[in-house]
C-alpha cells in the first residue's frame, strides 16, 4: 500500500473547479511563442531577503484557493484541480519576463515569484486570474513579507489576511450573463507594427517613468482618465514614429483590457474583464487631442485640444 505524502490531498478530498468563461481560451493558445503570462511587480525601499520571501509565499499560498491549483485536461474541457504541493521556489530573476510557465518544472503551479534587488515580481498564467486577481495576491504576499522582515509589524498586525484581501471565487461572467440577440460587426485589418523578431521565450522590455501628480494634472485638465490618456499617447507614438504622421488605409488599433468588477459590484479573484478596442484612422495630420477624440468619443469632452 502506498503511503500518502504529507500535505498532499487524497483522491477523495481533492478540490476541483471550472475555468471561468474567459479562461477556456488560454490553455489552447498558450505556448513558448505566446505565453499568456503577465507580470505585476512591487518595488520596496530595501533589498529583498529571498528566504523571508519564500516563507511569506509558503504562508500565503494555502489561503488562496485560486492560486493553489494545477490545470487538468478533461474529455472536452480543461479544469482546475487542487495542487497541494509545496509552493514553487522563489528565485532571483535572471531571465526574460513573462516566459511560458512549464507546469511540470514548477511543481504544477501556474505562477512564479522572482525578485531582483528591491523588487518582487509575480508572473501569472492568465488562465488563473486577470490583473486585479494578481494584484490581490501580490499585495497579500508583500504584506506578509514585510511582517516577517520587520518585527514591529508582527506585533501590531498579527498573521491574518489584510483587510481588503479577497478570496471570492465567484464566476462573475455566469452570474451577470444576460442573453441578447447576436449582432455581427466588421472591422478593417489593423496596422501591424514591424520590427526585429525575437526567439520564442524572449521579450523586449521598455521602461518609462513619470511623476503621477503631473500625469493626473494633465488628465484632469483634459477631463479624461489616466488609461485613456496613456492609450492615446501610445497610438500617437505609433502614428508619428511608424507612419511618420502620414495617412494609412489601416487603422491603428489597441486592445485595452477593462476590469468589469466596478460595473457589476464584484470582488471575484477569477478573470472578470473584457477587451475593448481603441481605434484611430490616420487620414491626415493629427494631434494627441484629436486622437483622444477619435478613440474615446463618449468620455472625451472635446476641450483643450
Residues covered by each model-derived region:
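Helix N-cap motif at beta-to-alpha junctions
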Residues: 47, 127-128
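Non-catalytic, low-complexity flexible loops and terminal extensions
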Residues: 2-21, 119, 128-136, 140-217
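Alpha-helical hinge/cap motifs
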Residues: 126, 219-227
Amino acid at each position: 500500500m502506498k503511503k500518502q505524502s504529507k500535505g498532499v490531498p487524497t483522491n477523495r478530498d481533492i478540490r476541483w473547479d471550472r475555468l471561468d468563461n474567459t479562461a477556456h481560451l488560454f490553455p489552447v493558445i498558450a505556448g513558448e511563442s505566446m505565453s499568456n503570462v503577465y507580470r505585476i511587480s512591487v518595488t520596496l525601499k530595501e533589498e529583498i531577503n529571498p528566504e523571508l520571501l519564500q516563507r511569506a509565499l509558503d504562508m500565503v499560498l494555502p489561503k488562496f484557493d485560486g492560486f493553489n491549483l494545477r490545470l487538468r485536461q478533461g474529455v472536452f474541457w480543461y479544469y482546475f484541480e487542487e495542487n497541494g504541493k509545496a509552493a514553487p521556489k522563489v528565485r532571483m530573476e535572471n531571465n526574460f519576463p513573462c516566459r511560458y510557465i512549464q507546469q511540470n518544472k514548477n511543481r504544477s503551479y501556474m505562477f512564479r515569484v522572482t525578485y531582483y534587488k528591491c523588487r518582487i515580481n509575480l508572473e501569472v498564467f492568465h488562465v488563473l486570474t486577470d490583473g486585479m486577481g494578481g494584484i490581490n495576491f501580490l499585495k497579500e504576499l508583500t504584506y506578509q513579507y514585510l511582517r516577517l522582515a520587520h518585527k514591529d509589524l508582527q506585533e501590531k498586525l498579527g498573521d491574518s489576511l489584510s483587510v481588503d484581501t479577497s478570496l471570492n471565487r465567484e464566476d462573475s461572467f455566469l452570474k451577470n450573463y444576460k442573453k441578447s440577440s447576436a449582432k455581427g460587426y466588421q472591422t478593417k485589418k489593423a496596422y501591424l507594427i514591424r520590427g526585429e523578431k525575437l526567439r520564442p521565450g524572449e521579450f523586449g522590455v521598455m521602461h518609462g517613468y513619470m511623476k503621477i501628480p503631473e500625469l493626473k494634472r494633465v488628465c484632469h485638465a483634459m477631463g479624461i482618465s489616466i488609461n485613456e490618456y496613456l492609450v492615446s499617447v501610445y497610438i500617437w507614438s505609433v502614428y508619428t514614429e511608424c507612419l511618420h504622421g502620414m495617412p494609412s488605409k489601416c487603422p491603428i488599433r489597441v486592445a485595452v483590457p477593462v476590469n468589469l468588477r466596478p460595473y457589476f459590484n464584484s470582488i471575484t479573484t477569477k478573470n472578470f474583464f473584457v477587451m475593448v478596442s481603441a481605434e484611430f484612422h490616420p487620414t491626415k495630420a493629427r494631434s494627441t487631442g484629436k486622437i483622444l477624440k477619435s478613440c474615446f468619443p463618449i468620455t472625451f469632452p472635446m476641450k483643450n485640444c
